[in-house]
């Protein structure tokens, strides 16, 4: 398979590895992006790719709760200037109120619904675009319902750059639920517990860690023990309950929550622009600098 400059650029953005290393990784894996990431990790050249790395899109996240329902949403704009605009922030809050009341199941359903003003959600956004002069998009949202004995936690970081909604069961207070949300904003876990990690992801991580150990020249008879030890670190990276609690690193999140008589049922973490447009380095200049060295 022909390795294109665009493929090399994408792999660089995902891993932070050098251009020539990325080209070699893609060549060795016949252009398979995921296998190329693993190849770089096995060689110790790159860490695991972060999906939210190098975000450039603007906008804000917002959370609203009422009774036993909560909504978290992300609305994008083209510039940070507009995201801080009072009219934009009012629009976000009005969209949140509508979503919380109507509880649409999908984004398409939400955009087609009629608001209290008589306009559809899409028309309401279009009217704001005409006034503000910039493209505005309702990117995503989630409506969460809880039982009477459950507690929501809401945390907005940097004016909504990151938004986290948690749902705790048991005797948790809103303060505990918010503390957990704050931790999630900072540490970015992917799952609540080990039970949620897909077996395919564990198998892939195990294989990468095994190859890392073998490439380090470790004897095969101790490789498995090393893999198990490093898997523990993997779980600490991706599982909320395994992580050292950000406000008291002497205890894990599991210990902190259980000491309050609670359990974590669910969390949703939105970061503005994650997975969208990425920072553009001057790729042409880097290519030229590499060519000159040859």
UniProtKB/Swiss-Prot annotation:
<dbReference type="InterPro" id="IPR001816">
    <property type="entry name" value="Transl_elong_EFTs/EF1B"/>
</dbReference>
<dbReference type="GO" id="GO:0005737">
    <property type="term" value="C:cytoplasm"/>
</dbReference>
<feature type="region of interest" description="Involved in Mg(2+) ion dislocation from EF-Tu">
    <location>
        <begin position="79"/>
        <end position="82"/>
    </location>
</feature>
<dbReference type="InterPro" id="IPR014039">
    <property type="entry name" value="Transl_elong_EFTs/EF1B_dimer"/>
</dbReference>
<protein>
    <recommendedName>
        <fullName>Elongation factor Ts</fullName>
    </recommendedName>
</protein>
<dbReference type="Pfam" id="PF25025">
    <property type="entry name" value="EF-Ts_N"/>
</dbReference>
<dbReference type="InterPro" id="IPR018101">
    <property type="entry name" value="Transl_elong_Ts_CS"/>
</dbReference>
<comment type="function">
    <text>Associates with the EF-Tu.GDP complex and induces the exchange of GDP to GTP. It remains bound to the aminoacyl-tRNA.EF-Tu.GTP complex up to the GTP hydrolysis stage on the ribosome.</text>
</comment>
<dbReference type="Pfam" id="PF00889">
    <property type="entry name" value="EF_TS"/>
</dbReference>
<keyword id="KW-0251">Elongation factor</keyword>
<dbReference type="GO" id="GO:0003746">
    <property type="term" value="F:translation elongation factor activity"/>
</dbReference>
<keyword id="KW-0963">Cytoplasm</keyword>
<dbReference type="InterPro" id="IPR009060">
    <property type="entry name" value="UBA-like_sf"/>
</dbReference>
<keyword id="KW-0648">Protein biosynthesis</keyword>
<dbReference type="InterPro" id="IPR036402">
    <property type="entry name" value="EF-Ts_dimer_sf"/>
</dbReference>
<comment type="similarity">
    <text>Belongs to the EF-Ts family.</text>
</comment>
């Amino acid at each position: 398979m022909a390795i294109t400059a665009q493929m090399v650029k994408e792999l660089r953005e995902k891993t932070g590895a050098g251009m020539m290393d990325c080209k070699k990784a893609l060549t060795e894996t016949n252009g398979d992006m995921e296998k190329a990431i693993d190849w770089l990790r096995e060689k110790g050249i790159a860490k695991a790719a972060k999906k939210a790395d190098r975000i450039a899109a603007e906008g804000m996240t917002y959370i609203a709760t009422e009774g036993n329902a909560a909504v978290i949403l992300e609305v994008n704009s083209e510039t940070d200037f507009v995201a801080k605009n009072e009219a934009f922030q009012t629009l976000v809050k009005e969209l949140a109120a509508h979503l919380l009341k109507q509880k649409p199941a999908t984004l398409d359903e939400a955009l087609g619904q009629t608001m209290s003003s008589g306009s559809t959600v899409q028309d309401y956004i279009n009217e704001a675009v005409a006034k503000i002069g910039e493209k505005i998009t309702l990117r995503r949202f989630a409506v969460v319902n809880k039982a009477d004995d459950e507690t929501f936690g809401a945390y907005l970081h940097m004016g909504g750059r990151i938004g986290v909604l948690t749902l705790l069961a048991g005797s948790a207070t809103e303060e505990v639920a918010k503390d957990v949300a704050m931790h999630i904003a900072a540490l970015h876990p992917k799952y609540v517990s080990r039970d949620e990690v897909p077996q395919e992801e564990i198998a892939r991580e195990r294989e990468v860690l095994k190859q890392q150990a073998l490439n380090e020249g470790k004897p095969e008879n101790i490789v498995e023990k090393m893999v198990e030890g490093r898997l523990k670190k993997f779980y600490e990276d991706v599982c909320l309950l395994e992580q050292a609690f950000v406000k008291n690193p002497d205890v894990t999140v599991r210990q902190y929550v259980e000491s309050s008589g609670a359990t974590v049922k669910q969390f949703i973490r939105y970061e503005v622009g994650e997975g969208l447009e990425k920072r553009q380095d001057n790729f042409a200049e880097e290519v030229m600098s590499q060519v000159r060295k040859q």
